[in-house]
């Protein structure tokens, strides 16, 4: 396997929160494990598939060698090959050509490929939400979010969670629901899903991550018009926001939304 040029740490584009975030050495290793665990693959097929995945991690301009390889039709080797073609298109931002193989691979007899294909369909729709909403400077304009893509992403996420309730991407899908809420300005849903994530956090790091996210995007976001006051089905988040609004430095702001007696009465 040719590992020349593979960085031990993710590149800048791998940590900016975009579609490249999953193209890193950790996912490369997980892919290798799937190749090793699949007894139907020959050593030659494993090497070819592994080298292609390395090429994608290097973001190399070299042409893929996979199309010339004679993988048997409907074999697991072909499923892995088609999966790699899909993620190649995905990381290049060619979402229409990424979607085609993943739609077919949902029915694959290779279980890891079938599950991952369904997850990738969710991520394709997620990225399509903001495909035309980010300018050349990286600034996000929520008014240009693709609402149809957002609805499709939620539909595909629900489909994944229904098909794989204990799947390997459950936490990712649930977390990305909050990103969809933010992309579309559905702040009540963001509060609800954020409070749910707080209750499900199993480590201090996970809890801190959700709290920081809610504070930046919702509770402490001064650019929300109108500002977030509360959400009936999210009592903890609502109570936290009331406490913040009761602070003296907030109450004296000309743009402050004053806490009412009715709110305090519950």
Listing of model-derived features with the role each one plays in the protein:
Residues 1-103, 113-266:
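Extracytoplasmic/secretory-pathway proteins
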């Amino acid at each position: 396997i040719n590992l020349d040029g593979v960085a031990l740490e993710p590149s800048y584009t791998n940590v900016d929160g975009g579609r490249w975030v999953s193209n890193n050495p950790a996912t490369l290793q997980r892919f290798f494990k799937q190749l090793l665990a699949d007894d139907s693959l020959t050593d030659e097929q494993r090497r070819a598939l592994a080298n292609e995945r390395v090429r994608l991690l290097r973001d190399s301009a070299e042409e893929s060698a996979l199309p010339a390889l004679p993988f048997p039709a409907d074999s697991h080797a072909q499923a892995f090959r088609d999966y790699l073609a899909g993620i190649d298109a995905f990381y290049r931002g060619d979402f229409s050509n990424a979607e085609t193989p993943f739609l077919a691979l949902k029915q694959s007899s290779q279980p890891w490929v079938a599950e991952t294909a369904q997850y990738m369909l969710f991520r394709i729709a997620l990225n399509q939400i903001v495909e035309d909403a980010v300018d050349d400077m990286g600034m996000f304009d929520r008014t240009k979010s693709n609402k149809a893509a957002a609805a499709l992403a939620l539909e595909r996420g629900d489909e994944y969670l229904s098909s794989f309730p204990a799947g390997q991407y459950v936490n990712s899908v649930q977390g990305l629901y909050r990103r969809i809420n933010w992309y579309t300005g559905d702040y009540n849903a963001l509060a609800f899903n954020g409070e749910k994530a707080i209750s499900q956090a199993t480590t201090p790091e996970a809890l801190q991550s959700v709290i920081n996210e809610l504070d930046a995007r919702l509770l402490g976001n001064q650019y929300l018009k109108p500002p977030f006051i509360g959400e009936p089905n999210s009592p903890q988040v609502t109570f936290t926001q009331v406490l913040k609004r009761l602070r003296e430095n907030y109450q004296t702001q000309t743009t402050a939304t004053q806490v009412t007696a009715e709110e305090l009465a519950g």
